[in-house]
């Protein structure tokens, strides 16, 4: 999604310097997934750009990512994984997870990443979008009072 929004929002529309997409999963207190898409823009462009965000999410849920994007994403994930292994926080987080859940996230990571297909991403996003569970937050700076 970062690649798509960089092309659409930043390069094509000139609407923002960058768009940040992030996701998180949690098990407790209940299982949930959060997908956040955050960007700053001119207030006059917020409606148009918000529409593009939803349009591109729906497109990805229907068509999936391109082969080029999949390759770039996998390369990035594997690089971040190798870099993370040099950090104590990576190992502490994984030890903590293993202690509490018994799940070893360090095992077979590269194999898992390489096994993900564009169809997997498309189907996952399609299921997510079918939930119709969206919250849109728009924050603006109040206009200065006329003096």
Residue ranges with predicted function:
Residues 1-3:
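His/Glu-based metal-binding/catalytic segments typifying zinc-dependent metallopeptidases
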Residues 6, 10-115, 133-141:
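M16 family metallopeptidases and their MPP-like homologs
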Residues 58, 126-129:
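A short, amphipathic alpha-helical segment
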Residues 118-126:
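Low-complexity, intrinsically disordered Gly/Pro/Thr-rich segments
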Residues 119, 131-132:
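Intrinsic-disorder/low-complexity regions
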Residues 129, 140-145:
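A short, acidic, flexible beta-alpha connecting loop/helix-capping segment that sits on the rim
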